[in-house]
Each structure stands twice: as structure tokens, then as C-alpha cells.
Amino acid sequence: MASKKIKVDEVPKLSVKEKEIEEKSSSSSSSSSSSSSSSSSSSSSSSSSGESSSSSSSSSSSSSSDSSDSSDSESSSSSSSSSSSSSSSSDSESSSESDSSSSGSSSSSSSSSDESSSESESEDETKKRARESDNEDAKETKKAKTEPESSSSSESSSSGSSSSSESESGSESDSDSSSSSSSSSDSESDSESDSQSSSSSSSSDSSSDSDSSSSDSSSDSDSSSSSSSSSSDSDSDSDSSSDSDSSGSSDSSSSSDSSSDESTSSDSSDSDSDSDSGSSSELETKEATADESKAEETPASSNESTPSASSSSSANKLNIPAGTDEIKEGQRKHFSRVDRSKINFEAWELTDNTYKGAAGTWGEKANEKLGRVRGKDFTKNKNKMKRGSYRGGSITLESGSYKFQD
């Protein structure tokens, strides 16, 4: 904890390139936890937004961003990234961008590291807020479906953590897929360094870790997943100067669809923005129907194949009884764990359990030939010859022709 706060104090002293590198690294650590669940990251981000607002309020452009309508964009709609409590000033082509980006970079690096530090503390609180936010989100989705999107309909699919929001108003914010919260949007603004630093400030200061892609068109459609978790965050009072209500309503300055985006994205783990949520649900339904149709086809085909197999096998099956052990006089009953009367063989090959030698029956064939040539008791007579007890005739090919003479 202490080490991270020291890093926050050191950030403003770094050069511009080092700031960008450290912003990405710090924001990626916070975004990894945010992608897991927007509800879990919500409480931590709300607490961090209070910290980030205090740091950015001293910055030069904090006055414009505190009103949370500060996102100066070409399109007339107010951006949903207005939830970024302090210098969110989403990248626009206006001239005020350079000031807000320089001030935002200092606040973003501090607040993003604060978010990662505060997330460990607020894990216990997240479970309670997740339930409340789910209830609120369900209500907000119904409202959002009736409300049209703002004038600049930015087509953006904020999938998972990375929200690559491409707006139609001539500005593309390509957010980094690795760091969702620091979506460094490269826009048509004056300088890329300004856009990255300002986008990072908007992402870190927004009261949500998840995707606050500061789209240049400032349309509400996608920072949607960012405003999504911010509304669920707003249960805990954010000290930021933005208009986000602590009562749980979405960012007041953000236009109509931000509240609806919150419900969908937070429920689906930051995956789909409002514009994509309908299509994604349709895809899910199509997949479900396809799976069901496959499931219906497979049992039908299997049922067709199994009767044919069973019929063919039943035709070939033979019920050959194993028989019973015949006990001769003077014999004891052989111990057996198997009751032969209950056993049936399905083929005649199974009834033969005679052992064929490992040498491919060559030993058995040789033994048969020797038995034919030298007699039935060849081995026994051979051993007698070794002992000298054999009394036979001259050795010929006829059986029993061996004889040793003293």
C-alpha cells in the first residue's frame, strides 16, 4: 500500500513517455480485476474516484471536467464518460484538450494506482453492492430500451475489458485491449500524447474500473460499460465533483443510454455495450437453438443406428450353455466362483479356452511330431536313458527303439 502511494507522488516528475508507460501499467493492473466482474470492481472504483477527484481538482482543467459536461466534442450529445469524476475531458478536437490532458495525466496515474490499492480493501463490500446493482440494473434496462441514443450514434463493441469504441462522428478511439480502464483513444486530436493522457485520466477518474473508453464523439454508447459499473458504484457516495448521484442513478450528465448500458454490461461481465447487447443476446439465442437442434438430431440418429446394430448382433448371437462339471467317482468338487449353469456363450470360438504357446504354437507342433516319431512317452523314456534304466532295442525311427547296452 505504502509503495503504491509513493509512486503516485512521483508520477508528475516523470517525462511524457514515462507517464504514458506507467499509466498503461497501472491501469492494466486495475483493469484485470475489473474484467473479472464489473460489480466487484465497482465499489473499489467508487472509493478511488473520491481520491482521484481530490488530486485532479488542483489541476488546471479540473473546473471544466468537474461539471462532468466538459467533454468538448464535435457531436452535440453529452458523453457517458462524464462519469469520470475529475478531468475526464474525453478526447475531442477542441482546443481545450491540451490543458485537460496534461492535468489529467497526473490525476489518472494517481487514481489508477489508488484503484488497484483500494480494490483489495473493498472486496468484502463488493458482494453486497453486486446484489443491489443487479436489481438496479434490471430496472434501468427497461427504461433504456425506450430511450433513443444521443445524436452521434457511435458504433462500438466494448467487449470484455477492451472497449474499442469507433464513433461515426469522424473520431476513432482505439482502446488498448490489455488495459480496459486506460483506453488510450487515438483520435484526430492535435497530439497523440494528449489524447492518451486525457483518456487515461478519464478512465482512471471515472468511478468504474471497467471500460471507460473516452470516445471522441462523446456519445454515450460506449464508455457504456464504464458508466455501467459506475452506476452500480454510485451506491457508495463518491466524493468526486461529478454529477453522478450516490442514490444509484447513472451519471446525471451522461445522456440517456448510459443507464441502460450499465445493466447489460454489468450483468454480462463488462462484455456488451448497449448497441451490441441486443445483437449478442440474439446470437446467444441462435446458439442455444442450434445446440438444441443438434441435440435433437443426435438422439434420433443414435436411436436409428442402435436398433439395426442390435438386430444384426442378435441374429449372430448364440446361446451356448457352458454346461456343468461332471464329477466322477472319487473326485472332489472343483472350487469355482462361477456358476456354469448361468453362463451362455454367444459364439463357438468363446468356448475354446485352450492355451496356445507364446511361440505361435511352434512348440506344440514340434511336440506332436516328436511324439509321432519317437513314441508317446518320448520325454519319459529320454530321462530313463539318461539314468541308464532304459531297456530298449536299437535306435531307429520307430517308436521305442532306444536301448543302452552295458
Curated annotation (Swiss-Prot):
Record carries keyword Cytoplasm: no
GO biological process: nucleocytoplasmic transport
Keywords per UniProt: Phosphoprotein
Keyword presence, Phosphoprotein: yes
Modified residues (Phosphothreonine): 289
Region described as Disordered: 1-335
Record PTM: Pyrophosphorylated by 5-diphosphoinositol pentakisphosphate (5-IP7). Serine pyrophosphorylation is achieved by Mg(2+)-dependent, but enzyme independent transfer of a beta-phosphate from a inositol pyrophosphate to a pre-phosphorylated serine residue.
Modified residues (Phosphoserine): 133, 293, 394
Biased composition (Low complexity): 26-115, 149-168, 176-186, 194-233, 243-268, 298-316
Origin: domain of life: Eukaryota
Record's compositionally biased regions (Basic and acidic residues): 1-25, 125-148, 283-297, 325-335
GO (cellular component) term, any one: nucleoplasm
Role this protein plays: Not known; weak suppressor of a mutant of the subunit AC40 of DNA dependent RNA polymerase I and III.
Misc. comment: Present with 12900 molecules/cell in log phase SD medium.
Protein name: Suppressor protein SRP40
Protein's gene: SRP40
